[in-house]
Amino acid sequence: MEVKVRRDELVPFVAMAIMEACTIALTIMAKTALTGGMSPFVFVVYTNAFGSILLLPFSFLFHRNERTEQSIFSWPLLVRVFFLGFTGIFMFQNLAFVGLRFSSPIVVCAMGLQIPSFSFLLSIILGRSKLDWRNTSTRAKLMGTIVSLSGAFVEELYKGPFIRPASSASPNRFLKSVPKLLVYYNLPDNWFLGCIFLAVAVFSVSLFNVVQTGTVKKYPHVMKVASFYSIVGTIQCLLFSLFMERDLSAWKIQPNFDLYLIIATGTFGSVIRTSVHVKCTQMKGPYYVPLFKPFGIFWATLFGTSFFVNSLHYGSVLGAAIAGVGYFTVSWGQLKESEEKQSSNEERKSIKTIHHRDEDEYKVPLLINQEESPV
């Protein structure tokens, strides 16, 4: 029994840590392809097209033993699917990869940690949340948002010196060859513009999360919903990319690094990572998977310092670390809020139960008296 408990704790942890490592590794590879001249818009179209082809049949296999009364082809759900594709695929991915082209993987990681803060601010703007200063969860989310945004400003405005300058590079031939194969950071860059693109991408995915939460409540087959909005988002990206990239040579992919990257990114992003996230959520709850997002800082720093020179700045790591602290603070506030709501609902149920019990105790003697009285 104890071994099973340990396994149930260890397997999701290791799986999520590996998912974050693979995400950063693919981000570095994408940076390499974009630096080599590949269009970010074409890359988004091809990866999502390939991923959608895999995800559609896989989603039906994933939910083959589940039934739902709600049809995915109802107008309310189709509108939601269109908006999910627009915000989560079209807006988010195009802006994110353009931002990556101008910055580096650790900047992408740090800006991605702003999602809970943006979601919190968005919920206030939309009237879904209220600022109750007496509430511990509200104070935690507000403080976490301030800290997280501070990390983003540090990331954007301060680079600092390189952690591993070329003069301190290892004489190891393998390490010297890695920067020639992969690119972590390149000059000239446009750090500020890259952060702006990434910030808008984060805002877009925050909108996506709001709509997705409501959609999953109406239609709980998560993988099917993901496959449909992936197809819709791919079509939107294709129409936009045909306008942006009118040179046919930009659409020609040779059987080289770019093609392998498209296949790997499409397979991992659409099927592998999504499946692992869904399974871990089912096993550990809705707040388990997001807690591993800051692991990307560790992997981005490890890869950047181990295999690349003149690539990772002290300011990048500092800003990402500050953003990570803010991320965990906001996440703790969200968890606290969820516990408070659950406790409040349980109290209401217990009060209703006591109220009904009192009514029953009051009604029973009357019924007895009625039965005993003559007709």
From Swiss-Prot:
Coiled coil: none annotated. It comes from the Eukaryota. GO terms for molecular function: transmembrane transporter activity. Its main location: membrane. Residues 25-134 form the EamA domain. It is a multi-pass membrane protein. GO terms for cellular component: endoplasmic reticulum; membrane. The keyword Transmembrane applies. Keywords: Membrane, Transmembrane, Transmembrane helix. It is found in: Membrane. Residues 337-356 are annotated as: Disordered. InterPro entries: EamA_dom, WAT1-related. One of its GO terms (biological process) is regulation of defense response to fungus. The chain crosses the membrane at residues 10-30, 41-61, 72-92, 106-126, 143-163, 191-211, 225-245, 259-278, 289-309, 312-332. PANTHER family: WAT1-RELATED PROTEIN (PTHR31218). Belongs to the drug/metabolite transporter (DMT) superfamily. Plant drug/metabolite exporter (P-DME) (TC 2.A.7.4) family. This is WAT1-related protein At1g70260. It comes from Arabidopsis thaliana (Mouse-ear cress).
